[in-house]
Design a protein with these regions (language model features):
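N-proximal low-complexity "stem/linker" segments adjacent to membrane-targeting elements
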Residues: 1-68
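Active-site-proximal specificity loops/subdomain of glycosyltransferases
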Residues: 6-20, 76-137
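Short acidic, S/G/P-rich loop/turn micro-motifs used as interaction or catalytic elements
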Residues: 39-44, 72-75, 108
Length: 137
């Protein structure tokens, strides 16, 4: 059961709704949620996800991992291209945990320069995934 303050936050303070996950998570609730901000990480993110995937399979069945691929609206083209490659590869990879990908990098979804960065990417992910977390009363 979501407590009153958390419910108020979810209803009023969530990040802009233009950032949506690539799919709706298959189940609810999850015991564990891992949020990963991803900026120009093609060479690293897959090692991180493989490391998570090597954990206890019973735990992974109840784990939701959210990767928010992000950049600012005035980002260098090479970073945007790196983020696009990362997104495409993530869509095709399979893991023992559920993976959600959030596009905060493409046209019309890139972050405004004044709010861009790891903190905003993490907020987007947490805001979207918090309602899938198992909360103890």
């Amino acid at each position: 059961m979501i407590n009153h303050k958390l419910n108020k936050y979810i209803n009023n303070k969530l990040a802009n709704k233009k950032w949506l996950p690539n799919k709706t998570p298959n189940k609810r609730p999850y015991d564990f949620i891992i949020t990963i901000p991803c900026y120009d990480e093609y060479d690293y993110i897959f090692k991180t996800l493989d490391s998570i995937n090597s954990q206890d399979k019973n735990i992974l069945k109840n784990t939701l991992v959210s990767v928010t691929i992000n950049n600012s609206i005035d980002e260098d083209r090479s970073i945007i291209a790196n983020n696009q490659r990362t997104y495409q590869k993530l869509l095709n990879n399979k893991y023992d945990f559920e993976l959600i990908i959030i596009d905060a990098f493409s046209k019309n979804k890139s972050l405004e320069s004044k709010i861009s960065g790891v903190g905003m990417a993490r907020k987007i992910s947490v805001d979207l995934m918090i309602s899938y977390l198992k909360l103890n009363s």
